[in-house]
């Protein structure tokens, strides 16, 4: 936990430093707009649970402050407030390694706030620019929903009837999330096309959660239960105050 906190704090201070450490040609430009995309999420469980990606939406508001251009790099900080659906979807196999008709998925709805440094290379006013994103991400779970099939294969283990699963991990069933606050590090790359009517942006991101959705003490069933996410996002931004390009 201490190591995870150090990593998160490093990402936060890296993003803030990009905002205030101005040593190049200064800029002072706000850009505001909307974003939307798709999230592919798994939960990294220990012990492991076989999974497919849980596909869900991610969408919200974006604010970007461009602070300087330094040796050709366009430096900015980007903050978003998003609705994000995470969770997991199980690939269910029996203790005999047979694929079962059972289905199970968990949907977790978050308010997500990434705070990212943006380093771009390319055109500022009109044309294309490539960029890198990196920084911390905070999220808060609003609700979680459990969906399971009517077919639910069970067997007897030590006189107890429980779901038939390949490695016997069943503690997640019926267990509500215990840690609503989620934090971690997000990074990605993208491309931006700037026109006279705004910025059109596409980016791909990877999020590595440093917190767990379930408690992880020695007495708890899971030592780890962290979000692990791929995201593809589309964003439209308009400069404020607006100026004709």
State where each predicted segment sits:
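Short glycine/proline- and aromatic-enriched beta-strand/turn motifs that initiate or cap beta-hairpins
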Residues: 21-62
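Short loop/turn motifs that connect adjacent beta-strands in outer-membrane beta-barrel proteins
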Residues: 22-29, 68-75, 122-129, 194-199, ...
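Residues that define the transmembrane beta-barrel architecture of outer-membrane proteins
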Residues: 28-30, 53-57, 107-113, 128, ...
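Transmembrane beta-strands of outer-membrane beta-barrel proteins
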Residues: 30-36, 73-79, 111-113, 130-138, ...
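Extracellular loop and loop/strand-boundary signature of outer-membrane beta-barrel proteins
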Residues: 44-50, 98-105, 172-176, 217-224
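Outer-membrane beta-barrel transmembrane domain signature
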Residues: 118-201, 205-217
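Outer-membrane beta-barrel "beta-signal"
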Residues: 226-245
């Amino acid at each position: 936990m201490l190591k995870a906190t150090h990593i998160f704090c490093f990402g936060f201070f890296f993003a803030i430093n990009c905002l205030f450490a101005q040593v190049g040609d200064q800029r002072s430009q706000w850009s505001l707009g909307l974003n939307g995309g798709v999230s592919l999420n798994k939960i990294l469980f220990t012990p492991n649970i076989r999974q497919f990606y849980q596909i869900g939406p991610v969408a919200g508001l974006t604010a970007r402050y461009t602070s300087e251009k330094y040796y050709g790099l366009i430096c900015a900080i980007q903050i978003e407030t998003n609705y994000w659906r995470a969770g997991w979807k199980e690939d269910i196999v029996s203790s005999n390694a047979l694929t079962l008709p059972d289905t199970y998925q968990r949907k977790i709805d978050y308010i997500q706030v990434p705070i990212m440094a943006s380093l771009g290379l390319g055109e500022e006013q009109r044309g294309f620019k490539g960029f890198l994103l990196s920084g911390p991400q905070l999220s808060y779970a609003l609700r979680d929903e459990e969906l399971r099939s009517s077919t639910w294969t069970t067997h007897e283990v030590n006189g107890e009837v429980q779901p038939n699963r390949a490695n016997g991990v069943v503690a997640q069933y019926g267990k509500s999330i215990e840690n609503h606050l989620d934090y971690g590090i997000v990074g990605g790359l993208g491309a931006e096309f700037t026109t006279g009517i705004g910025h059109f942006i596409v980016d791909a991101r990877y999020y590595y959660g440093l917190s767990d959705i379930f408690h992880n003490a020695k007495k708890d069933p899971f030592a780890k239960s962290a979000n692990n996410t791929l995201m593809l996002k589309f964003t439209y931004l308009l400069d404020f105050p607006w100026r004709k390009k």
